[in-house]
Amino acid sequence: MKYASNNIRNILIAGHAGSGKTTLTEALVYFSGAAERMGRVEDGTTISDFDPEEAKRKASLSASVVPVEYEGIKYNLIDAPGLFDFEAGEYEGIRAAESVLVCVSGRSGVTVGAEKAFQLARKNGKATMVFVSKCDLENANYFKILEDMKIKFGSTVCPCVVPAKLDDGTPVYINLFSQKAFKYEGGKQVQVDLPDIGHRFQGLIEAMSEAIAETDDELMEKFFGGEAFTTEEIVEGMRKGVKDGLITPVFCGSAVNQQALDMLLYNMHKLLPSPEHNSVLAEDANGEPVELTCAESEPTAAYVFKTVADPFVGKLSYLRVVSGKITAGASLVNARTGETEKMGKPLTVMGKKQTEAESIGAGDIGAVAKLVSAKTGDTLCDASRVVKLPAPVFPKPSLFMAVTVAKKGDEGKISSALARLMEEDPTLSYVNNAETHQQIIGGLGEQHLDVVKAKLKNKFGVEIGLEAPRIAYRESIRKACQKQGRHKKQTGGHGQFGDVVINFEPCDSEQVVFEEKVFGGSVPKNFFPAVEKGVRLAAEKGVLAGYPVVGLKATLLDGSYHPVDSSEMAFIMAAKLAYKAAMPEAGPVILEPIHTLKAHVPNDNTGDIMGDVTKRRGRVLGMEPDEDGLQTIIAEVPLAELANFTTFIRQTTQGRGWFTTEFARYEILPEMLVPAVVKQARKLGNLDESADD
């Protein structure tokens, strides 16, 4: 069935892992009558968690789209992962939604995942609603959670449905709008007498009324006049407050036992915005801002918010249609590449189930298979109006591991399989490090990379191992040294002869610098390039650990030649001999890469993080606040010391903190650490016999 944009609600369901997001999604599908039975996370039978890895780990690993149709309204629910290693799902989903439903566990309370989801919603200007789940459990403490929410989410928090219990312990839910109470029998609502919750009831009504009054001058006047609001005024004031970010309504219930879901669905319809009047800002072909209206009569503009790579079916692109509509055979321009994409048959998606549709209308969500150039973050638009919607900024990888191949010859397969996985996961990176000869993958944490490893095996038939990446050290010298290199070899016929005197000294360049100051014809000019080539070839391996040499200046001063036996190869060999003679006496050192670290952490954790940076041989350069209310610690730390920093910062900040690193420069490795690096170099075969003396 096709829905007008005013009858669509696009809602991201977000929160901490284990707070009940997937169970709530499943419960709403079952409540709407779209499923004959309700799946369970524990059994791996939910609609949302259809990936084999999700079923195995009993947790959401990516965002999934689950539409719920109920009483003429289509709710496109986007169930996002709560595990921090997979937070890309929240960043994808929030771009397709007008609203965010933050799920909070009635047992665990307001955990970090809920805080981060609320902040992400606010940062992106989304309407926000809270659902406190598991309220029928014995140890649920709704009112304590409510107070915590007011502290962590701010004064916009406004309870709309609160739990209570009858004398026999039966859970009931009080609707503060209607001031009526309901219990649930088999998911069906049964009105009961309003239970006595003491002074709380009047306080809740007054707090809600005051929040509503602040949305409108007339309502404010009525409030101060002591008049009660009508149900219509309550709903309209609440709706306006939600849209303007002045009110965060809080609902509650039990997803597992189908309690108070009717009130949640009704109010998601009444209080949360539809796409109809939610105009979106984009850029036109000249980079000028343009407002897109959600109407099918407008030129088409659709946003690719998620990509799924399937080795058998191919690529599936999830689209949020901002204006116009998607139809089979339509040609749309990819605003990023300028290429034209021909649309396949539009699909409606329910978890893994795909159903062909005539079109995907303005404001709705659907999918198209086998697009060629489109990737997550792209805008597909009509050629008559090329526009680009802002692409999301995803968290950057912070944990990097080297790939080891279980089966020889699979290197090529790994590259192509990882390229496919990167299409569906913007927080995954992959590079071939030419210097260390390793394939390096980067992700958001150990769980993330473990899932990547499992997907490579199960989806693409490629088995890999993961190990710490090698560090790309360098070598240099600290003082000047002048040495002769004489290469003489006599055989039958022509011999080989080359003789050079070269001065080696430190310099500021990151490369090897070559000069010549030869007087007279002791070394003919036509052999200068051979001498330079010999120096550069030799400098590819330092004498301590076989790493490339930088910051080296070599000056050719003198030498000699033989009119018959001298050759280009002879002078290359002579230059190498001079290098090998000079370097051990020139104060050789190993250089290690230093990275600039920017750690974003809560103020309470700054001391722990700075202390840890110091233990890692780092230098703290300063601290400044960031735009999200965290403190940014700026430091310089050796790359070799950052191996487990991802785990440390997450544990220390309970998942609130994050960091980025960027190469800064090379510095001399402390002498006490040199033996270990040399030992590792020997193990890797960096040192040949001539460099191993």
Enumerate the language-model features and the residues they cover.
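Structural and coupling elements of P-loop NTPases
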Residues: M1-D693
